[in-house]
Protein backbone atom coordinates (compact mmCIF):
# COMPACT_ATOMS: atom_id res chain seq x y z
CA UNK A 1 0.00 0.00 0.00
CA UNK A 2 2.85 2.37 0.83
CA UNK A 3 4.38 1.78 -2.59
CA UNK A 4 1.04 2.54 -4.24
CA UNK A 5 0.67 5.79 -2.28
CA UNK A 6 4.25 6.69 -3.19
CA UNK A 7 3.32 6.50 -6.87
CA UNK A 8 0.21 8.59 -6.20
CA UNK A 9 2.47 11.26 -4.70
CA UNK A 10 4.81 11.10 -7.69
CA UNK A 11 1.84 11.23 -10.07
CA UNK A 12 0.42 14.31 -8.37
CA UNK A 13 3.84 15.97 -8.60
CA UNK A 14 4.23 15.29 -12.32
CA UNK A 15 0.57 15.99 -13.02
CA UNK A 16 0.72 19.35 -11.27
CA UNK A 17 3.73 20.48 -13.32
CA UNK A 18 2.32 19.18 -16.60
CA UNK A 19 -1.05 20.81 -15.95
CA UNK A 20 0.50 24.21 -15.23
CA UNK A 21 2.48 24.12 -18.48
CA UNK A 22 -0.50 22.82 -20.46
CA UNK A 23 -2.79 25.51 -19.01
CA UNK A 24 -0.59 28.28 -20.40
CA UNK A 25 -0.44 26.51 -23.74
CA UNK A 26 -4.20 25.97 -23.98
CA UNK A 27 -4.99 29.58 -22.99
CA UNK A 28 -2.86 30.90 -25.85
CA UNK A 29 -4.36 28.37 -28.24
CA UNK A 30 -7.82 29.49 -27.22
CA UNK A 31 -7.01 33.08 -28.22
CA UNK A 32 -4.82 32.58 -31.32
CA UNK A 33 -5.89 29.07 -32.39
CA UNK A 34 -2.21 28.43 -33.09
CA UNK A 35 -0.01 25.95 -31.16
CA UNK A 36 2.64 28.03 -29.41
CA UNK A 37 5.82 25.98 -29.72
CA UNK A 38 7.72 28.80 -27.99
CA UNK A 39 6.00 27.91 -24.71
CA UNK A 40 8.69 25.32 -23.99
CA UNK A 41 11.30 28.06 -24.28
CA UNK A 42 9.34 30.20 -21.79
CA UNK A 43 9.45 27.25 -19.39
CA UNK A 44 13.22 26.97 -19.87
CA UNK A 45 13.70 30.74 -19.48
CA UNK A 46 11.79 30.71 -16.19
CA UNK A 47 14.09 28.05 -14.77
CA UNK A 48 17.23 29.89 -15.87
CA UNK A 49 16.09 33.28 -14.55
CA UNK A 50 15.25 31.75 -11.16
CA UNK A 51 18.55 29.86 -11.13
CA UNK A 52 20.49 33.04 -11.96
CA UNK A 53 18.72 35.09 -9.30
CA UNK A 54 19.52 32.46 -6.67
CA UNK A 55 23.09 31.63 -7.69
CA UNK A 56 24.40 35.02 -8.82
CA UNK A 57 22.37 37.45 -6.73
CA UNK A 58 21.70 35.33 -3.67
CA UNK A 59 17.92 35.73 -3.86
CA UNK A 60 15.80 33.35 -1.84
CA UNK A 61 13.63 30.77 -3.54
CA UNK A 62 10.34 32.68 -3.49
CA UNK A 63 11.83 35.97 -4.64
CA UNK A 64 13.57 34.09 -7.46
CA UNK A 65 10.25 32.49 -8.43
CA UNK A 66 8.50 35.87 -8.46
CA UNK A 67 11.34 37.42 -10.46
CA UNK A 68 11.23 34.58 -12.98
CA UNK A 69 7.45 34.91 -13.32
CA UNK A 70 7.70 38.65 -13.99
CA UNK A 71 10.60 38.24 -16.43
CA UNK A 72 8.93 35.48 -18.44
CA UNK A 73 5.58 37.31 -18.43
CA UNK A 74 7.37 40.31 -19.96
CA UNK A 75 9.19 38.04 -22.42
CA UNK A 76 5.96 36.33 -23.49
CA UNK A 77 4.18 39.67 -23.89
CA UNK A 78 7.06 40.97 -25.98
CA UNK A 79 6.88 37.88 -28.19
CA UNK A 80 3.15 38.44 -28.65
CA UNK A 81 3.66 42.06 -29.70
CA UNK A 82 6.67 41.55 -31.96
CA UNK A 83 6.04 38.09 -33.41
CA UNK A 84 2.48 36.80 -33.06
CA UNK A 85 0.40 39.96 -33.32
CA UNK A 86 1.77 40.98 -36.75
CA UNK A 87 0.92 37.46 -38.00
CA UNK A 88 -2.63 37.46 -36.63
CA UNK A 89 -4.23 37.40 -40.07
CA UNK A 90 -1.62 35.15 -41.69
CA UNK A 91 -2.20 31.49 -42.45
CA UNK A 92 -1.77 29.01 -39.61
CA UNK A 93 1.63 27.87 -40.86
CA UNK A 94 3.30 31.28 -40.46
CA UNK A 95 2.67 31.70 -36.70
CA UNK A 96 3.81 28.11 -36.14
CA UNK A 97 7.09 28.75 -37.94
CA UNK A 98 7.49 32.01 -36.03
CA UNK A 99 6.92 30.19 -32.72
CA UNK A 100 9.61 27.65 -33.59
CA UNK A 101 11.90 30.57 -34.43
CA UNK A 102 11.27 32.12 -30.99
CA UNK A 103 11.98 28.73 -29.40
CA UNK A 104 15.31 28.34 -31.19
CA UNK A 105 16.30 31.96 -30.50
CA UNK A 106 15.64 31.70 -26.76
CA UNK A 107 17.46 28.38 -26.49
CA UNK A 108 20.49 29.81 -28.30
CA UNK A 109 20.38 32.88 -26.05
CA UNK A 110 20.26 30.71 -22.91
CA UNK A 111 23.19 28.63 -24.15
CA UNK A 112 25.19 31.78 -24.92
CA UNK A 113 24.53 33.25 -21.46
CA UNK A 114 24.63 30.21 -19.18
CA UNK A 115 26.35 27.61 -21.35
CA UNK A 116 25.20 24.18 -22.46
CA UNK A 117 26.00 22.48 -19.14
CA UNK A 118 23.44 21.07 -16.74
CA UNK A 119 22.80 23.16 -13.62
CA UNK A 120 21.32 22.19 -10.28
CA UNK A 121 18.99 24.64 -8.55
CA UNK A 122 19.14 24.43 -4.79
CA UNK A 123 15.96 24.25 -2.76
CA UNK A 124 15.49 25.56 0.78
CA UNK A 125 13.08 22.68 1.37
CA UNK A 126 15.25 19.58 1.59
CA UNK A 127 13.40 17.82 4.39
CA UNK A 128 11.51 14.53 4.23
CA UNK A 129 8.05 13.93 5.66
CA UNK A 130 6.78 10.42 6.43
CA UNK A 131 3.04 10.08 5.85
CA UNK A 132 1.55 6.63 6.49
CA UNK A 133 4.77 4.98 5.38
CA UNK A 134 5.13 7.20 2.33
CA UNK A 135 8.39 9.12 1.94
CA UNK A 136 7.37 12.59 0.86
CA UNK A 137 10.10 15.13 0.08
CA UNK A 138 8.96 18.59 1.15
CA UNK A 139 9.75 19.97 -2.32
CA UNK A 140 7.27 17.54 -3.88
CA UNK A 141 4.59 18.50 -1.38
CA UNK A 142 5.32 22.13 -2.19
CA UNK A 143 4.91 21.41 -5.91
CA UNK A 144 1.54 19.75 -5.35
CA UNK A 145 0.23 22.51 -3.08
CA UNK A 146 1.49 25.37 -5.24
CA UNK A 147 0.39 23.82 -8.54
CA UNK A 148 -3.16 23.08 -7.42
CA UNK A 149 -3.41 26.40 -5.61
CA UNK A 150 -2.42 28.19 -8.80
CA UNK A 151 -4.93 26.17 -10.82
CA UNK A 152 -7.69 27.17 -8.38
CA UNK A 153 -6.61 30.81 -8.57
CA UNK A 154 -6.70 30.70 -12.37
CA UNK A 155 -10.16 29.09 -12.33
CA UNK A 156 -11.50 31.80 -10.02
CA UNK A 157 -9.86 34.50 -12.13
CA UNK A 158 -11.46 33.23 -15.33
CA UNK A 159 -14.88 32.63 -13.76
CA UNK A 160 -15.26 35.41 -11.20
CA UNK A 161 -13.55 38.47 -12.70
CA UNK A 162 -14.47 40.74 -15.58
CA UNK A 163 -10.97 40.47 -17.02
CA UNK A 164 -11.12 36.68 -16.95
CA UNK A 165 -14.50 36.79 -18.66
CA UNK A 166 -12.99 38.81 -21.51
CA UNK A 167 -10.43 36.05 -22.08
CA UNK A 168 -13.20 33.45 -22.27
CA UNK A 169 -15.25 35.67 -24.59
CA UNK A 170 -12.26 36.27 -26.87
CA UNK A 171 -11.54 32.55 -27.04
CA UNK A 172 -15.14 31.73 -27.93
CA UNK A 173 -15.63 34.42 -30.57
CA UNK A 174 -12.88 36.93 -31.29
CA UNK A 175 -14.89 39.00 -33.77
CA UNK A 176 -17.98 39.10 -31.57
CA UNK A 177 -15.94 40.08 -28.52
CA UNK A 178 -14.32 42.92 -30.46
CA UNK A 179 -17.73 44.16 -31.60
CA UNK A 180 -18.93 44.55 -28.00
CA UNK A 181 -15.87 46.63 -27.10
CA UNK A 182 -13.35 44.11 -25.79
CA UNK A 183 -9.79 45.16 -26.63
CA UNK A 184 -8.37 42.17 -28.52
CA UNK A 185 -4.78 43.39 -28.24
CA UNK A 186 -5.02 43.84 -24.48
CA UNK A 187 -6.56 40.40 -23.99
CA UNK A 188 -3.90 38.75 -26.16
CA UNK A 189 -1.10 40.44 -24.23
CA UNK A 190 -2.66 39.47 -20.90
CA UNK A 191 -3.11 35.86 -22.01
CA UNK A 192 0.52 35.57 -23.08
CA UNK A 193 1.62 37.14 -19.78
CA UNK A 194 -0.43 34.61 -17.80
CA UNK A 195 0.98 31.74 -19.86
CA UNK A 196 4.49 33.03 -19.15
CA UNK A 197 3.80 33.19 -15.41
CA UNK A 198 2.45 29.63 -15.39
CA UNK A 199 5.47 28.32 -17.31
CA UNK A 200 7.97 30.13 -15.07
CA UNK A 201 6.33 28.99 -11.83
CA UNK A 202 6.15 25.40 -13.08
CA UNK A 203 9.83 25.46 -14.05
CA UNK A 204 10.93 26.99 -10.74
CA UNK A 205 8.92 24.45 -8.77
CA UNK A 206 10.28 21.47 -10.69
CA UNK A 207 13.90 22.57 -11.22
CA UNK A 208 15.15 21.62 -7.70
CA UNK A 209 14.27 17.95 -8.34
CA UNK A 210 15.34 18.06 -11.97
CA UNK A 211 18.11 19.86 -13.88
CA UNK A 212 18.30 23.24 -15.61
CA UNK A 213 19.65 23.25 -19.18
CA UNK A 214 18.83 24.96 -22.50
CA UNK A 215 16.86 22.06 -24.02
CA UNK A 216 14.84 21.29 -20.88
CA UNK A 217 11.63 22.55 -22.45
CA UNK A 218 11.56 20.08 -25.34
CA UNK A 219 10.06 17.05 -23.61
CA UNK A 220 7.82 19.15 -21.36
CA UNK A 221 6.23 21.06 -24.24
CA UNK A 222 5.81 17.85 -26.24
CA UNK A 223 3.89 16.31 -23.35
CA UNK A 224 1.94 19.54 -22.89
CA UNK A 225 0.75 19.24 -26.49
CA UNK A 226 -0.25 15.64 -25.83
CA UNK A 227 -2.17 16.83 -22.77
CA UNK A 228 -4.14 19.58 -24.51
CA UNK A 229 -4.96 17.23 -27.39
CA UNK A 230 -6.17 14.63 -24.90
CA UNK A 231 -8.16 17.16 -22.91
CA UNK A 232 -9.52 19.06 -25.90
CA UNK A 233 -7.72 21.92 -27.64
CA UNK A 234 -8.40 25.16 -25.79
CA UNK A 235 -10.11 23.51 -22.80
CA UNK A 236 -8.92 24.60 -19.35
CA UNK A 237 -10.53 21.65 -17.49
CA UNK A 238 -9.12 19.36 -20.16
CA UNK A 239 -5.59 20.65 -19.57
CA UNK A 240 -5.87 19.94 -15.84
CA UNK A 241 -7.42 16.49 -16.23
CA UNK A 242 -5.07 15.60 -19.07
CA UNK A 243 -2.04 16.65 -17.03
CA UNK A 244 -3.11 14.46 -14.12
CA UNK A 245 -3.79 11.51 -16.42
CA UNK A 246 -0.31 11.74 -17.95
CA UNK A 247 1.31 12.31 -14.55
CA UNK A 248 -0.31 9.24 -12.98
CA UNK A 249 0.27 7.12 -16.08
CA UNK A 250 3.99 7.94 -16.11
CA UNK A 251 4.38 7.40 -12.38
CA UNK A 252 2.63 4.02 -12.26
CA UNK A 253 4.02 2.97 -15.64
CA UNK A 254 7.60 3.67 -14.58
CA UNK A 255 7.12 1.69 -11.36
CA UNK A 256 5.12 -1.30 -12.57
CA UNK A 257 6.50 -1.59 -16.11
CA UNK A 258 9.87 0.13 -16.60
CA UNK A 259 11.36 3.60 -16.41
CA UNK A 260 12.62 3.02 -19.97
CA UNK A 261 9.05 3.36 -21.25
CA UNK A 262 7.98 6.26 -19.03
CA UNK A 263 8.05 8.89 -21.78
CA UNK A 264 6.38 6.61 -24.32
CA UNK A 265 3.31 6.10 -22.14
CA UNK A 266 1.99 9.61 -22.83
CA UNK A 267 1.96 9.01 -26.57
CA UNK A 268 0.39 5.58 -26.16
CA UNK A 269 -2.42 7.17 -24.15
CA UNK A 270 -2.82 9.81 -26.84
CA UNK A 271 -3.44 7.15 -29.49
CA UNK A 272 -5.77 5.16 -27.23
CA UNK A 273 -7.96 8.05 -26.07
CA UNK A 274 -8.19 9.72 -29.47
CA UNK A 275 -9.21 6.42 -31.05
CA UNK A 276 -12.14 6.32 -28.62
CA UNK A 277 -12.90 10.05 -28.40
CA UNK A 278 -11.32 12.01 -31.29
CA UNK A 279 -12.40 15.42 -29.94
CA UNK A 280 -10.56 14.82 -26.66
CA UNK A 281 -11.94 14.37 -23.15
CA UNK A 282 -13.55 17.81 -23.16
CA UNK A 283 -14.87 19.85 -26.07
CA UNK A 284 -12.88 22.76 -27.42
CA UNK A 285 -12.98 26.24 -25.95
CA UNK A 286 -11.54 27.98 -22.91
CA UNK A 287 -14.01 27.80 -20.03
Model regions and ranges:
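Membrane-interfacial amphipathic/re-entrant helices at transmembrane-helix boundaries
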Residues: 1-21, 49, 56, 60-64, ...
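Helix-loop-helix "hairpin" substructures at the membrane interface of multi-pass membrane proteins
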Residues: 14, 135-212, 236-242
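Transmembrane alpha-helical segments in multi-pass inner-membrane proteins
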Residues: 18, 58-70, 189-199, 203-270
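Membrane-embedded helix boundary and interhelical linker motif in transport proteins
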Residues: 28-78, 82
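Hydrophobic core segments of alpha-helical transmembrane domains in multi-pass membrane transport
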Residues: 47-51, 69-75, 102-110, 146-155, ...
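Alpha-helical transmembrane segments within multi-pass membrane transporters and channels
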Residues: 58-102, 109, 241-246, 277-278
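Cytosolic-side transmembrane-helix boundaries in multi-pass membrane proteins
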Residues: 82, 113, 172-179, 183-186, ...
